């Protein structure tokens, strides 16, 4: 199991929080102190919590479960899409549509429409339409792809959410909480950790920090899937007990 170390976090600026006047008291126990009116996050607390979250994700992936990556703010979107694609995971990088989880039946219909338009764009249907109609369908396709392209292959509800900036993605977290879907979240000093099952106290704005979180999570998914492909059982400690029962 590959883990993140303190040096990685320091280089990425994970320890830099927000201005002290914007702090959320619920994050007090994760704050080391302040420097130039900026809160400094205690990485001795962040490090084990992040590695615990990575272990959880690796175990989920080894069971062929789906982790939905969510990061829709400008600094996160591109990295979220790239790393999710690298590990073959679903993602939301543009805007969280209300009901994406709690009203998945309706979302599924929109995904079906997206697929129909993709087929029409490829099979020459658009070319047979009037210019106006072709333009309207192209715009529909682009709009649906921007909103739902990252989850079109998800197939059903995810088994966990990984969220960059829990305040920005509060609607997604609330929906996951309602459905009992575990939430892993990067929580900065100005945010509330409520509703987050695996808290990662850290900078949620710096691009290098976001790259570290997302790259590490994608690697954990890939490791978990490789465990399945290679026949490795990450729950190997349970195997003897199971064998004894069968015997």
Curated annotation (Swiss-Prot):
GO terms for biological process: translation. InterPro entries: Ribosomal_uS2 (IPR001865), Ribosomal_uS2_bac/mit/plastid (IPR005706), Ribosomal_uS2_CS (IPR018130), Ribosomal_uS2_flav_dom_sf (IPR023591). GO terms for cellular component: cytosolic small ribosomal subunit. GO terms for molecular function: structural constituent of ribosome. The keyword Nucleus does not apply. It holds the Pfam family Ribosomal_S2. Keywords: Ribonucleoprotein, Ribosomal protein. PANTHER family: 30S RIBOSOMAL PROTEIN S2 PROKARYOTIC AND ORGANELLAR (PTHR12534), SMALL RIBOSOMAL SUBUNIT PROTEIN US2M (PTHR12534:SF0). Belongs to the universal ribosomal protein uS2 family. This is Small ribosomal subunit protein uS2.
């Amino acid at each position: 199991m590959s883990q993140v170390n303190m040096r990685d976090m320091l280089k990425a600026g994970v320890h830099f929080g927000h201005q002290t006047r914007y702090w959320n008291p619920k994050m007090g126990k994760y704050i080391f102190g302040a420097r130039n009116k900026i809160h400094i996050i205690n990485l001795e607390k962040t490090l084990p919590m992040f590695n615990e979250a990575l272990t959880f994700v690796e175990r989920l992936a080894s069971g062929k479960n789906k982790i939905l990556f969510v990061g829709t703010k400008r600094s996160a979107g591109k990295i979220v899409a790239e790393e999710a694609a690298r590990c073959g995971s679903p993602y939301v990088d543009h805007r969280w549509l209300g009901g994406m989880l709690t009203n998945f039946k309706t979302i599924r219909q929109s995904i079906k429409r997206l697929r129909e338009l993709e087929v029409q764009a490829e099979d020459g249907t658009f070319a047979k339409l009037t210019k106006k109609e072709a333009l309207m369908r192209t715009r529909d396709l682009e709009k649906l792809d921007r909103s739902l392209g990252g989850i079109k292959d998800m197939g059903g509800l995810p088994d966990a959410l990984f969220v960059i900036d829990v305040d920005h993605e509060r609607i997604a977290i609330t929906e996951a909480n309602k459905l009992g879907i575990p939430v892993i979240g990067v929580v900065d000093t100005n945010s509330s950790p409520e509703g987050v099952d695996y808290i990662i106290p850290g900078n949620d704005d710096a691009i290098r920090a976001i790259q570290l979180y997302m790259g590490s999570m994608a690697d954990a998914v890939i490791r978990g899937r490789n465990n399945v492909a290679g026949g490795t059982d990450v729950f190997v400690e349970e195997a003897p007990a199971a064998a004894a029962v069968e015997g």
